[in-house]
Amino acid sequence: MKNLFKKILLVAFAASFCLVLPSCGGKAVIENSVIGQSWNDMVHGDKAVMLVSYTDGFMSGNNTSDKDKITSATDCLQNIEKHVVKEIEKPDDSSFSEFMGKFYLLDFETDYSFWSASSSALEIPEGNTLLTFWFYGDILIVTDVQLVLGDYGVGKSAYFKLDKSAQKTVENLIETFK
């Protein structure tokens, strides 16, 4: 019984460190990934977001440059980072069945033509950022896009596992753009 009590105290002590050490949180997990700098630039305001786009399918986009909606989107993404448990390897295709939606954050102006699958490629201007956020149930894929081909972004991607309580925050983000 004494050993069980010691183990419980040890686990509680270790868990309390994760609450106070930033390296245990979702933000630190994201910052240590290949998209970390771009995430900070776009989600935490080091760069001005010019456009947010949301789609719940692959062919349509709801684009806005409204400052309030951009602020709402970046606030929700900051809340979502709190739900990041860990970075994961690219999951197998069966993990992508619960598609919830896809967001784009851009720090440059464009004619939005790349939202159409029939469009030509859009190369991201040097020094600019386009981040895509794909939500699949408890998986978040973030891509720092260098080139858009039709409706698909080509670039560096990171895959994150979200905790079970993340779904409400993701739904709030989606609701902002419906």
What feature does the model see in each segment?
Residues 11-13, 34:
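Short, functionally important structural connectors and interaction interfaces within domains
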Residues 19-23:
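C-terminal motif of bacterial Sec signal peptides marking the signal peptidase cleavage site
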Residues 25-178:
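Function-determining sites in protein domains
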Residues 13-15, 58:
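A generic, residue-level signal for flexible/boundary positions that often mark functional hotspots
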Residues 15-16, 88:
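Repetitive helical segments and hydrophobic/amphipathic motifs
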Residues 1-11:
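Bacterial N-terminal signal peptides that target proteins for export
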